[in-house]
Regions:
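Conserved, mostly hydrophobic/aromatic
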Residues: 147, 167, 184, 220, ...
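Conserved SAM/AdoMet-binding glycine-rich loop
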Residues: 74-78, 83, 93, 176-300
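Short glycine-enriched, charge-decorated loop/helix-capping segments at active-site entrances
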Residues: 47-48, 156, 196-199, 259-265, ...
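Terminal RNA-binding accessory module
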Residues: 332-432
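Conserved beta-strand core positions
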Residues: 3, 40-41, 135, 182, ...
């Protein structure tokens, strides 16, 4: 059977999609790029915030249109399927099956029945849907933190860490098929292992992953500030493969709001962690995520956030307006902020960060940096790639450069930076 697949949402959901596609291919089915050629369509949805839910619903309706012309089966899974299982089944009759996340332990058998496979759909080798030299590895699922604004624990449950042995089996396979950049992900990577080993095991995992031959860059995303302990930093410093990239979602800088968000620790603790990182890794890249317009946020508290951004000068920052998510503690809080004020604050915050980013990038002019070559622009001698300071999938900026010699995509080269914009830098490939 020909199967169309649509994956929405974050990189953690993408890993789920790649694993589902692996099972489908093992069952003898073919993944097709164009839904019009499909006999069944699977939509792996996101349901994290309102805009993601809207995108998921719109995609489901778009895929449902193919049922008008063909006898297409429409299967919906993922976060939206978990959060609104009954609603989807009742209100969108075009859907043939809704498979919530917490039924993924029976996913293989459900797909086998729906798709009519004669082959057992069990754990299979990973499909990589993006560039073959880059892959994500999800080290745990769910989250045991209870941030007041976040629906992830409602959707995916408490943290469930994989064993190191299971992770290493996947890592070794990915390295064997040519993956050079490995990105470890979870809702909270620094809490990895606490649920099944009884202690924080990220340092041990990093030490084992760094021994795998073929890997060139190892990156860790989603690190909770108070869990970036000395052993984590020590493990990262022990291997040149582990890039000094620290993704620390902080959410705000006002201690009253941090407490209201149910975030652990005041901003002063984050300052101490940042100082420690810079001491051990002078060339570290620091990234964070902020929320503006959380209930009761005053103008003065927002300005405190702006001042904090100016003080830290994060290399990278993503920011979002607060999204009111039902069944979360923040949903019924007094002092909900008007959308217009939220958007205005977001624009002001990102304008400040844009200037900081531009300043940081301009400091790179004249330097020679290592770049992973990812794209060639047409027939010209211009390429696009990323440095160790840039996370995959356009999360951060790019390095745009020229080369006198043709370059192999997926290779690493040296680039001298000659110009810089707010988010991208420009340069010329130089010989080793």
């Amino acid at each position: 059977m020909k199967i169309g697949f649509v994956s929405l949402g974050c990189c953690k959901n993408l890993v789920d999609s790649e694993q589902i596609m692996s099972m489908i291919k093992r069952g003898g089915h073919e993944i097709v790029a164009n839904p019009k050629d499909a006999q069944a369509i699977i939509v792996n949805t996101c349901g994290f915030i309102e805009s993601a839910k809207e995108e998921s619903i719109n995609t489901i309706f778009k895929m449902a249109k193919y049922k008008e012309r063909n006898l297409v089966k429409l299967i919906v899974c993922g976060c939206l399927a978990q959060r609104y299982t009954d609603t989807l089944r009742e209100e969108i009759p075009e859907i043939d099956a809704v498979i919530p996340i917490r039924e993924y332990d029976t996913l293989a058998s459900q797909l086998q029945k729906l798709l009519g496979s004669d082959t057992l759909l069990d754990k299979a080798e990973r499909v990589i849907t993006g560039n073959p030299w880059q892959a994500y590895v999800k080290i745990s699922d769910g989250c045991s933190n209870r941030c007041a604004y976040c629906a992830i624990p409602l959707i995916r449950g408490d943290q469930k860490s994989r064993t190191i042995e299971d992770i290493m089996e996947e890592v070794n396979y990915l390295a064997s098929v040519g993956v050079k950049e490995l990105t470890l992900i979870a809702q909270d990577t620094t809490k990895y292992g606490l649920d099944n080993y009884g202690k924080l095991m990220l340092p041990e995992l990093l030490r084992q992953v760094s021994k795998v031959e073929g890997l060139h860059w190892i990156r860790v995303l989603y690190m909770y500030p108070d869990e970036i302990v000395d052993d984590v930093l020590q493990a990262m410093s022990e291997s040149e493969k582990i890039v000094p990239y620290f993704d620390i979602p902080m959410q705000h800088a006002n201690n009253r709001l941090l407490k209201l968000m149910n975030r652990r620790g005041p901003k002063e603790d984050v300052l101490k962690v940042v100082d420690k990182i810079h001491t051990m890794f002078p060339n570290a890249t620091l990234r964070t995520t902020m929320i503006v317009g959380f209930p009761t946020e005053t103008e003065e508290e927002f300005e405190e956030l702006v001042d904090f951004i100016k003080e830290i000068k994060w290399d990278r920052m993503g920011a979002f307006t607060y999204s009111k998510e039902e069944d979360t503690p923040a949903y019924d809080m007094d002092g909900q902020i008007d959308e217009e004020i939220q958007n205005e604050r977001l624009a002001r915050l990102m304008a400040v960060q844009e200037e900081i980013s531009k300043e940081k990038n301009q400091e790179k002019i004249g330097r020679v940096i290592e770049v992973l070559v990812e794209e060639k622009e047409g027939l010209v001698d211009r390429y696009r790639g990323r440095s160790a300071a840039d996370a995959p999938d356009e999360v951060d900026g790019q390095v745009i450069f020229t080369s006198d010699e043709p370059l192999e995509l997926g290779s690493f080269v040296k680039v001298k930076i000659t110009d810089a914009k707010s988010y991208d830098v420009y340069g010329t490939c130089v010989s080793e």
